Amino acid sequence: MNTIHVDVVSAEESIFSGEARFVALPGEAGELGIYPRHTPLITRIRPGAVRIEKADGTEEFVFVAGGLLEVQPNCVTVLSDTAIRGKDLDEAKATAAKALAEEALKNAKNDIDIAMAQSELAVMAAQIAALRKYRQKK
C-alpha cells in the first residue's frame, strides 16, 4: 500500500507524525488533497482543519491557525504557530474567544487594531467550523 509520511508541527510540539494514505487541508487558493508521490509544493495554508487518512484507514483531524505546507513525493510537512488535535478542541473556549474578537473589532480605533481583530475572528470562526466538522466525522 502506498503511504506518505506526514508531520504536523506547532510552535510548541509535534502534533502528528506518521504514515498516511491521504491528507486534505485548506490551501490559500482552496482545498488541497495530497496523495503519495504528489508533485513537490510549498504554499501557505489558511486556518482550518487538516484531515489525515492514516495508513490503517482511521482519520486524524488537526486544527491549524494557518501556516506553511511543504510537500515532497514521500513527505508532507505542516508548520503552524497554533495546531490543536481535533479531540482537544473546546467549542466553549473558541466561542468565547470569537465573541472577544468581535468585541475587539467593534472597539478598534486604528487599522492595526482592526486587522488584528479581523485575523483573530477569522481564526476562531475557522476553529469552530473545524470542530463541527470533526464532530460530524466521529
UniProtKB/Swiss-Prot annotation:
GO CC terms, sorted: plasma membrane; proton-transporting ATP synthase complex
Protein name in UniProt: ATP synthase epsilon chain
NCBIfam families: ATP_synt_epsi, PRK00571.1-4
InterPro entries: ATP_F1_dsu/esu_C_sf, ATP_synth_F1_dsu/esu, ATP_synth_F1_dsu/esu_N, ATP_synth_F1_esu_C, ATPsynth_dsu/esu_N
SUPFAM superfamilies: Epsilon subunit of F1F0-ATP synthase C-terminal domain, Epsilon subunit of F1F0-ATP synthase N-terminal domain
Assembly behavior: F-type ATPases have 2 components, CF(1) - the catalytic core - and CF(0) - the membrane proton channel. CF(1) has five subunits: alpha(3), beta(3), gamma(1), delta(1), epsilon(1). CF(0) has three main subunits: a, b and c.
Family annotation (Pfam families): ATP-synt_DE, ATP-synt_DE_N
Family recorded in the similarity comment: Belongs to the ATPase epsilon chain family.
Keywords in alphabetical order: ATP synthesis, Cell inner membrane, Cell membrane, CF(1), Hydrogen ion transport, Ion transport, Membrane, Transport
Protein role: Produces ATP from ADP in the presence of a proton gradient across the membrane.
An MF annotation (GO) of this entry: proton-transporting ATP synthase activity, rotational mechanism
Superkingdom of source: Bacteria
UniProt membrane topology term: Peripheral membrane protein
Subcellular localization, as worded in the UniProt entry: Cell inner membrane
Main location: membrane
